[in-house]
């Protein structure tokens, strides 16, 4: 393919608002074009990469026994109202009305729609298990789109769904998808971790996340040098709290003017922050019409893990209380909240590290005052103890090794949904005994366009993108140094023909640009192999450069095809080490 015929608008500088390396380089290399905040056009090079990713996905899905289909992106809201996600999904859900004032959404995911098709199409367990998937654009009204195509309002996604008559069928489908996902990411050339994760708004109790370590990752991976890895929302560590043995002292209220944080209160009271209780008021949505105020107590040096609180309460949503909520339930302002004297209408949860404390300090539910020497049971109640904290780096993980943290990009997620959706939407089949039973579901997703950012983050350098050979837009970039010289262009065309006939995809830079511009653009674009046709063309010699390493070698034209094959094979083997 001739480069002069392809839209590749390279730039010398990235936009000033581009933060991530992948964002900067994909714009500079002419892969993407911003239409609006969070909305992108994928230009020819990017689209070629996407198609290669899709082909790998389709191949592995076929091997896993999944069948491709396609759902609409515009969905009637009725099913989402029936499942409860029309409200619980929050502000990220695009909502709209048609001309007849009927509610619709732009699909951020398709559990409900696939479940409806299954419900209306399959009535017997004999038709199960079934695994289906689609490759389709999704829509989420992100509050803060950022990092280019890493977090946008429209993006392509693989979403797959399994339907089984029993738990064994779900387990088999889940394991097959997990294997397929590993194969996909291995073939693409990503460094990734499979981690324990929280299911969030998806429902279900068991899930695993595939996360690509990267500096711009918005998730925190807690992992060890052993087998343990988890999203920070799910991560656990060995409990090391020691029961304090001090004699409970009389509770006292002390003035703490201007102290609104744990550390300010600790300084005012001359206490260690881990002896001060952090009291966080939340409003939990338990059902469509039921809301529960919840006070979560943490040791002062710990942070609340809201995902763990949601799971403990089994609630649909959890929101930090407003100032009005605090006044309504505790007659106080945030910054001076505490558990002493709190009424029964407020549920009190306390982290396990609070349980071992004696003579602790806490807010007095009065501005400018704190209690000291407050003790559980004597001075305030706790309705439920549990692990409600974020783990810390260096703590001991369940596998006995110290935890390490690294940021990661979520590139895939698999869920055991169980009957979360089928029970709500009436997806049932007759079992072997002729009884109606809810279908057992799994859900599986990969962010297709997000993968491009993840690969770029892990592989780009200061000169541009560096694509793995499996998804590069072309295999070889042929550059005649001087397109005005007939011998160089003739050799470039001959090389193009030879490589194409050998099964390689070739981009020939036939532009009448300076050599420096061509080489800079080639580095930006990131094609694995560059073949330079220069002054030695008259002797039948060309230079090969490996984009990833910068290594160069001169070869005769008749040896070129064989050498390119060897180099690409080596790159592929190194990628999979």
From Swiss-Prot:
Is the keyword Ion transport assigned to this protein?
no
What is the catalytic activity of this protein? tRNA(Pro) + L-proline + ATP = L-prolyl-tRNA(Pro) + AMP + diphosphate
Q: Which GO terms describe its molecular function?
A: aminoacyl-tRNA deacylase activity; ATP binding; catalytic activity, acting on a protein; proline-tRNA ligase activity; transferase activity
- GO annotation (BP), single: prolyl-tRNA aminoacylation
GO CC annotation: cytosol
The keyword RNA-binding is assigned to this record: no
Q: Which PROSITE patterns match?
A: AA_TRNA_LIGASE_II
> What UniProt keywords are attached to this protein's entry?
Aminoacyl-tRNA synthetase, ATP-binding, Cytoplasm, Ligase, Nucleotide-binding, Protein biosynthesis
Q: At the top level of its lineage, which domain of life is listed?
A: Bacteria
CDD domains, alphabetized: ProRS-INS, ProRS_anticodon_short, ProRS_core_prok
- Please give the InterPro entries that the UniProt record associates with this protein: aa-tRNA-synt_IIb, aa-tRNA-synth_II, aa-tRNA-synth_II/BPL/LPL, Anticodon-bd, Anticodon-bd_dom_sf, Pro-tRNA-ligase_IIa, Pro-tRNA-synth_IIa_bac-type, Pro-tRNA-Synthase_IIa_type1
- Report the enzyme's class at the first EC level: ligase
Localization terms from the record? Cytoplasm
Tell me which EC number(s) this protein carries.
6.1.1.15
Q: What does its UniProt record remark on the domains?
A: Consists of three domains: the N-terminal catalytic domain, the editing domain and the C-terminal anticodon-binding domain.
Query: What family is reported?
Result: Belongs to the class-II aminoacyl-tRNA synthetase family. ProS type 1 subfamily.
What does the protein in this record do? Catalyzes the attachment of proline to tRNA(Pro) in a two-step reaction: proline is first activated by ATP to form Pro-AMP and then transferred to the acceptor end of tRNA(Pro). As ProRS can inadvertently accommodate and process non-cognate amino acids such as alanine and cysteine, to avoid such errors it has two additional distinct editing activities against alanine. One activity is designated as 'pretransfer' editing and involves the tRNA(Pro)-independent hydrolysis of activated Ala-AMP.
This protein's assembly is summarised as: Homodimer.
Protein name, UniProt field: Proline--tRNA ligase
Organism, by scientific name, is Limosilactobacillus reuteri (strain DSM 20016)
């Amino acid at each position: 393919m001739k480069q002069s015929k392809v839209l590749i608008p390279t730039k010398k500088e990235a936009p000033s608002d581009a933060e991530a390396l992948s964002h900067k380089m994909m714009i500079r290399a002419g892969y993407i074009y911003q239409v609006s905040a969070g909305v992108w056009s994928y230009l020819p090079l990017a689209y070629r990469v996407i198609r290669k990713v899709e082909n790998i996905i389709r191949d592995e899905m076929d091997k896993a026994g999944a069948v491709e289909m396609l759902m609409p992106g515009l969905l009637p809201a009725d099913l989402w109202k029936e499942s409860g996600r029309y409200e619980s999904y929050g502000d990220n859900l695009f909502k709209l009305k048609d001309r007849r004032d009927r509610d619709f959404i732009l699909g951020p995911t398709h559990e409900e729609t696939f479940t409806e098709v299954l419900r209306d199409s399959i009535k017997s367990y004999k038709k199960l298990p079934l695994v289906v998937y689609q490759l389709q654009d999704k829509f989420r009204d992100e509050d803060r789109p950022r990092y280019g195509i890493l977090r946008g309002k429209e993006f392509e996604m693989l979403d797959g769904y399994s339907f089984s008559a029993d738990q064994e069928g779900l387990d088999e489908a889940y394991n097959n998808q997990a294997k397929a996902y590993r194969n996909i990411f291995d073939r693409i050339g990503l460094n990734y971790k499979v981690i324990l994760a929280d299911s969030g708004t998806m429902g279900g109790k068991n899930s695993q996340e595939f996360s690509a370590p990267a500096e711009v990752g918005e998730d925190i991976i807690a992992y060890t040098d052993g087998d343990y890895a988890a999203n920070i929302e799910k991560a656990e560590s060995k409990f090391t709290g020691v029961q304090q043995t001090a004699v409970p002292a009389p509770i006292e209220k002390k003035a703490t003017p201007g102290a609104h944080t744990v550390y300010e209160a600790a300084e005012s009271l001359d206490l260690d922050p881990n002896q001060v209780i952090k009291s966080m008021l939340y409003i939990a949505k338990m059902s469509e019409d039921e809301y529960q105020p919840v006070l979560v107590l943490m040791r002062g040096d710990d942070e609340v893990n809201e995902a763990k609180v949601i799971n403990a309460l089994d609630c649909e949503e959890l929101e930090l209380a407003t100032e009005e909520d605090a006044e309504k339930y505790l007659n106080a302002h945030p910054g001076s909240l505490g558990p002493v004297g709190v009424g029964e209408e407020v549920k009190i949860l306390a982290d396990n590290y609070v349980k071992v404390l004696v003579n602790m300090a806490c807010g007095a539910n009065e501005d400018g005052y704190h209690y000291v020497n407050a003790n559980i049971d004597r001075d305030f109640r706790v309705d439920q103890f549990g692990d409600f904290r974020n783990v810390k780096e260096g703590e001991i993980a369940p596998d006995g090794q110290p935890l390490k943290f690294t940021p990661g990009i979520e590139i895939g997620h698999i869920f055991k949904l169980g009957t979360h959706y089928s029970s709500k939407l009436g997806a049932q089949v007759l079992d072997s005994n002729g009884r109606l039973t809810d279908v057992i579901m799994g859900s599986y997703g990969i962010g297709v366009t997000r993968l491009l950012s993840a690969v770029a983050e892990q592989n780009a350098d200061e000169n541009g993108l560096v694509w793995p050979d499996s998804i590069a837009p072309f295999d070889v970039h042929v550059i005649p140094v001087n397109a005005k010289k007939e011998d160089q262009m003739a050799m470039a065309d001959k090389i193009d023909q030879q490589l194409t006939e050998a099964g390689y995809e070739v981009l020939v830079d036939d532009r009448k640009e300076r050599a420096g511009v061509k080489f800079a653009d080639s580095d930006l674009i990131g094609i694995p192999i560059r073949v330079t046709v220069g002054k030695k063309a008259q002797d039948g010699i060309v230079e090969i450069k490996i984009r990833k390493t910068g290594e160069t070698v001169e070869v005769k034209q008749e040896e070129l095809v064989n050498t390119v094959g060897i180099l690409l094979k080596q790159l592929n083997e190194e990628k999979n080490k």
